[in-house]
């Protein structure tokens, strides 16, 4: 009986995982309306938490191991595992986003952009992927591109101080 309960819990977590999770719509609605930084931070954390759950246990284990490699700076190992993740679960947006992040950290910006595009095709509201893309545009001195992306982030998170500040700075530079 105990094993059955554990299996049900495990299955229910994976059945409600990733960017297709029904809870996300409500969280994004609340995030859009939030004017309280503490509340917005909690909502962002909850969204990331949901995004970080793969649709199957095998992918989840590999994804978690890749995160551990990332945390200790073993980026090549992280990329190797994240490549397995996106091959096993190509609909798992956070797998693509995490690999985009590692490519960014390695300075492989074109590969990062490619994975960001895949992330955004799966989850257009992925503010983390959008923020990464804006950072790349800034590195490439594409202020107009970065401004467009910061506006997109503000459509999702109107209270984002970072996006507001960056957009203001870019607009001041473009004048």
Placement of each model-derived feature along the sequence:
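Register position in tetratricopeptide repeats
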Residues: 71, 105, 139-140, 156, ...
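N-terminal leader/linker segments that initiate helical-solenoid repeat arrays
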Residues: 16-64
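A conserved position within tetratricopeptide repeats
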Residues: 31-35, 48, 86, 120, ...
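Boundary/linker segments of alpha-helical solenoid repeat arrays
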Residues: 38-41, 127-128, 157-168
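Alpha-helical adaptor scaffolds
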Residues: 56-122, 128
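Residue-level signature of tetratricopeptide-repeat
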Residues: 99-100, 106, 133, 140, ...
């Amino acid at each position: 009986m105990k094993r059955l309960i554990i299996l049900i819990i495990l299955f229910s977590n994976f059945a409600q995982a990733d960017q297709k999770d029904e809870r996300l719509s409500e969280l994004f609605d609340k995030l859009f309306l939030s004017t309280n930084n503490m509340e917005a931070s909690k909502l962002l954390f909850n969204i990331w938490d949901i995004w970080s759950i793969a649709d199957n246990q095998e992918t989840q284990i590999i994804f978690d191991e890749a995160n551990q490699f990332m945390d200790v700076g073993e980026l090549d190992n992280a990329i190797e595992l994240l490549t397995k993740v996106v091959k096993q679960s190509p609909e798992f947006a956070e797998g693509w986003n995490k690999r985009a992040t590692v490519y960014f950290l390695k300075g492989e910006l074109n590969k990062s952009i490619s994975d960001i595009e895949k992330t955004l095709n799966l989850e257009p509201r992925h503010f983390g992927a959008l923020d990464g893309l804006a950072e790349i545009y800034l590195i490439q001195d594409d202020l107009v591109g970065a401004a467009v992306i910061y506006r997109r982030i503000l459509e999702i998170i109107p209270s984002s101080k970072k996006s507001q500040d960056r957009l203001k700075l870019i607009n001041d530079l473009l004048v």
